[in-house]
Regions:
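Peripheral terminal and linker regions in Fe-S/redox and tRNA-modifying enzymes
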Residues: 1-330
Length: 330
């Protein structure tokens, strides 16, 4: 009897997706179709898009009295590390929700912006206009490092909060996917043509490899007196240590997550536990090492138990800490 573990189907989809391309570009050009195939819909999450069934439209009927059936629309989520967004970008999102969406703009509990009710034919223009404001939807969803959160206020004349934001920005930059799929599929050149969509040219993906992470990975940065991001509910929480008015390091908490599947007794909520104390200049490398440990050892056979909290529960803190140190080369 084989001991080989059967992987979840999503793992094969990612592995054979040409670094998150799939056949998204060709399906995007298909006329008469308002949705993507199931495999591509899964890949689209990494691009910040969720394909959704418009349930209200199910009630509508054709001229002959027959029901129209399923009608699809999309949610578009913008990734904004630390939640800092310019007035220009915010106003652009308000404009987009009126022009292409259902008229609503949602500010998420994880410092992102969401447009709803976008139809397939308007996706590319929506993403292109978000990009013009120097923001992106790439990595806002999917099996990657999600939006890195940070307590934003006060915005000015506060060196500690400035350092927190710098840490959040640095982690977000370090852990962003390197694939060029997003640029090639969604962004256009000056003539309005999508770039290089016919030929797959792989790039080095040093952190995520071919299959990215087993599931999403969430990070938050905050202070003891202002835990506005609720960092103990994340895979990784960095709690700032302030001495003599300056930020000197972080207490590292890992393994948080409140998600539960009611029908699966094996799932459970968890509060993050302290793993270590690190210096400010060590925060990024420790974050990367933890993500790499999760990449290599997380559960890829069952997505219900594929978060870091389950790996921590299985291993225990000492083994987890020791493995992270190995990845750091210590």
């Amino acid at each position: 009897m084989s001991d080989e573990v059967k992987l979840d189907k999503s793992e094969s989809v990612k592995q054979h997706s040409d670094q998150l391309r799939g056949t998204i570009a060709s399906e995007l050009c298909e006329s008469g179709s308002d949705h993507f195939t199931k495999d591509n819909a899964g890949l689209l999450k990494h691009h910040g898009l969720y394909q959704q069934d418009n349930r209200d439209a199910r009630k509508l009927k054709n001229e002959d009295g027959t029901r129209r059936g399923k009608s699809f629309m999309f949610m578009v989520r913008t990734r904004i590390p630390g939640g800092r967004v310019s007035a220009e970008s915010f106003l652009a999102h308000l404009d987009l929700c009126e022009r292409f969406g259902n008229g609503t703009l949602r500010i998420t509990s994880r410092q992102g912006l969401q447009l709803h009710g976008i139809v397939k034919d308007d996706l590319q223009q929506t993403i292109r206009e978000i990009s013009r404001t120097r923001l992106t939807t790439f990595g806002a969803c999917g099996d990657v490092e999600r939006n890195v959160m940070c307590c934003p206020a006060p915005l000015r004349h506060d060196a500690v909060h400035d350092q927190l934001q710098q840490t959040a920005d640095a982690i977000a930059e370090e852990l962003r996917p390197r694939t060029t799929a997003y640029t090639e599929i969604w962004l256009q050149d000056d003539e309005g043509n999508r770039e290089n969509v016919t030929e797959f040219v792989p790039v080095d993906e040093p952190i995520y490899g071919a299959t990215y992470l087993p599931r999403k990975f969430k990070t938050g940065v905050s202070l003891p007196e202002d835990n506005c991001v609720d960092l103990l509910t994340y895979d990784l929480g960095l709690l700032g240590i302030v001495e003599d008015g300056g930020l000197v390091g972080y207490n590292v908490f890992i393994g948080g997550g409140q998600g539960v599947t009611p029908s699966a007794a094996k799932t459970f909520p968890a509060i993050a536990r302290k793993m270590a104390r690190v210096g400010v200049d060590e925060a990024v490398e420790v974050s990367r090492a933890l993500v790499e440990v999760f990449r290599d050892h997380g559960n890829r056979s069952d997505r219900k138990t594929a978060r870091l909290k389950y790996l921590l529960a299985d291993w225990g803190m000492e083994r987890m800490k020791g493995t992270v140190e190995e990845y750091l080369g210590r």
